[in-house]
């Protein structure tokens, strides 16, 4: 089994419950293809670098998992047909250095999940 990271962006028009349901759907696909989900990093609502499907913002989520090559095709097929997902990217970690970095990312994602959420900081604006 190889190490993979999939980042996907969900439409910003969804409610929190709908967004959580879409993320759960993708996690269910991982379970169906016998992928081992190691960590999830919910990055939250962010501004996109450029408009995608007339959206300037999106809800980012990163999944770290181990799976075989055939599973990736099914995961990406489900991401393509999901109308709520506006963009996605899957990265395969192959070399030892890449796998070491993958392990660090998984540890950081699990650590941030265990830590209590910090209060959002107020944005500063210059006059």
Curated annotation (Swiss-Prot):
One of its GO terms (biological process) is translation. It comes from the Bacteria. GO terms for molecular function: small ribosomal subunit rRNA binding; structural constituent of ribosome. It holds the Pfam family Ribosomal_S6. InterPro entries: Ribosomal_bS6, Ribosomal_bS6_sf, Ribosomal_S6_plastid/chlpt, Transl_elong_EF1B/ribsomal_bS6. Coiled coil: none annotated. CDD domains: bS6 (cd00473). Keywords: Ribonucleoprotein, Ribosomal protein, RNA-binding, rRNA-binding. GO terms for cellular component: cytoplasm; ribonucleoprotein complex; ribosome. PANTHER family: MITOCHONDRIAL 28S RIBOSOMAL PROTEIN S6, SMALL RIBOSOMAL SUBUNIT PROTEIN BS6M. Belongs to the bacterial ribosomal protein bS6 family. Binds together with bS18 to 16S ribosomal RNA. This is Small ribosomal subunit protein bS6. It comes from Sulfurovum sp. (strain NBC37-1).
């Amino acid at each position: 089994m190889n190490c993979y990271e999939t980042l996907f962006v969900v439409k910003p028009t969804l409610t929190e419950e709908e967004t959580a349901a879409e993320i759960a759907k993708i996690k269910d696909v991982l379970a169906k293809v016998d992928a081992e989900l190691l960590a999830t990093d919910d990055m939250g609502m962010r501004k996109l670098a450029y408009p995608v499907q007339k959206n300037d913002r999106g809800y980012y989520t990163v999944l770290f998992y181990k799976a075989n090559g055939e599973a990736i095709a099914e995961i990406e097929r489900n991401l393509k047909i999901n109308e709520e997902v506006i963009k996605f990217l899957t990265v395969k970690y192959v070399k030892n250095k890449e796998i070491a970095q993958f392990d660090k990312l998984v540890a950081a994602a699990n650590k941030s999940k265990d830590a209590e959420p910090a209060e959002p900081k107020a944005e500063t604006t210059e006059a």
